[in-house]
């Protein structure tokens, strides 16, 4: 087999169920020496062909990746790795497996695939190797002896039982599973009695279907024989275990299998007997016992369940796991994490319950189950699978004619919209995301269902493109309603999404309040996923406030926790925050952290990858490497397009890059866009960059106005990260007009604030800063310079801000010309140049159209112009005054 795998890229182990295909595959894989290792993909519990690729992705350690197909993620991850992938139990998913193999072998030249299946996959280039039964004279006998000694310590094969053991192995065709069943009976039967028991079993099957393949007859003989040895009560329990997939616990068995003919209190005893007779496997899972049926045995049990006419057992199985899922939405205090972990353990049963409901037309129940699992879809990064569940019903015309509760459909549409928003399947705010949310809201209001309404309102807020103003009324109503119906999980989600909007506001105080409120609730219900995000927001608020040490410590702590919990999305955001803080601290470690952020984001794809490149842009800018920063920014931009807020905030970085590269016109446009679309810290930084652009273009009045506006923005919201940059700009501008002492005092105040907050100037601005310092020192002399510097450094931050703003109103603008225009008038000119009407300009500036016309009248008078056309032409000639 090793030789086959060395010469062929696809080898399939074929054979009957129970012949040992999986065991052989594991042994072969364990002996593999491919340098990049192996992965094992267990397809036995998978019932949906659509998640075969996702199952393979999870086997190699890839979580859901927003913004990229699972197949593309697999191709990228495996790439040129020399590795072995084992696809186990392919027979019920042949088409999906074939598609997966074609894609991976075509894209990954060093990948080898070893498959196990009851029949060949049926592909060109496939090498099929049929797994034989064990040698009856030695291997099968050794297996029987080994398994018998486990149930009856001291058992050995001797002269008195060797012939009987040989007979058992021969008549069971050397099939390992059948031999293991037989050996398990040594607890209560001798080998001779076991051999005699096989006589009746084979006679029972002698009249079976002639066309049936031998392997099915042989395996069925073994299982039929084991089944015949059960009591009637044991047989009832055995067949009622058939709906379970991937394992189950005692509580589940009692809920699903017990009934009038099976006392709940006797279930444990009967289950123990089935374990003893090797029809059920008992596993110790972290101190708790879980049970499972081997797949071939489960299929046999399914046939018996079908023959019994007990179809309600499937419904009881579905109802039990639906109730488990529903408990996720009503967690008791600090119970959320435990419930999520339990649901994750039972994910295969939840999948089976959903599949059975959908296949049997129980659409209401299927949608309820999918909606109840929102905490799993979000908290355990199963977002793509969750969306596929909703799409498999909501987008399938076959199910549209089936009656579904309006409230259930409304909630399903809302939950789908939230998943689509998170995955960024379309640009946030796009119609195909907003429309389902709005439809859900209309339906929920129509039926007056509070639970559906609160989900629909939340979805509308989430899908509104991170527009805090647009989302506010939805979130406000949803918050009141969630509190009224005591829906803590949904309330936590509402507070979370409101926090996202607050991040975009750039207000550290508002963000701190939102983060603490949401984190407190998340901690109360035990939702660590949301709690970690809130803590990252707190680190962001600390950064904006200039508390860089605290911001770095908190972001490191949360990143480590996220990594330990395999919470990749939070890990990416944590690394991004670290890289940003380290960049502002001037630490060389920012580059390595940004690299780690990109690597982690690659697992997720989509907007997260854009965030990773944005982190590298910060690190490179801080280090003065404009080329590397441009490369990272160019990689980030197209990815971030699906998230308007991210694009807008990235404009600030692009403005800095353009200016550092000598393109002042592009820098101004980027800065203008950022100033128009941002608030808080983001706007303060954008104004500072625009002031730098104006300085570079020889427009001191414009530079002074923007620098003062940046300073005022920071002072109003207590934002100190970035404030020294504005102070240093004002210092240089003061020196240019002869206010040397004022300029040096501002330099001293800026230096003191940098020392206090650990802020370091980005290296790309060092040359301009040093030029200002040199000019002021030469103008004043060393002694006066040092004295003024010390005076500025002695000022408190508030005193320094007041000092910088003190002379702002004293400077007079000229009566005519471009320099006479106020900041608002310059904004109006710029927007007119962009082709906007007065009405559109009014919307952008949050004023009335009449006010816009008044500004234009003043502009015409100051510039000596008579029309809009003349204004546009003159602005174009000057390169716009803004």
UniProtKB/Swiss-Prot annotation:
Keyword DNA-binding: yes
Domain HTH luxR-type: 814-879
Molecular function GO labels: DNA binding
DNA-binding region listed in the record: 838-857
Domain of life: Bacteria
Keyword Isomerase (UniProt): no
Keywords linked to the UniProt accession: DNA-binding, Transcription, Transcription regulation
An annotated GO BP: regulation of DNA-templated transcription
Signal peptide per UniProt: none
InterPro entries for this protein: P-loop_NTPase (IPR027417), Sig_transdc_resp-reg_C-effctor (IPR016032), TPR-like_helical_dom_sf (IPR011990), Tscrpt_reg_LuxR_C (IPR000792), WH-like_DNA-bd_sf (IPR036388)
A Pfam family this chain is assigned to: GerE
Protein name: Putative HTH-type transcriptional regulator Mb0914c
Organism: Mycobacterium bovis (strain ATCC BAA-935 / AF2122/97)
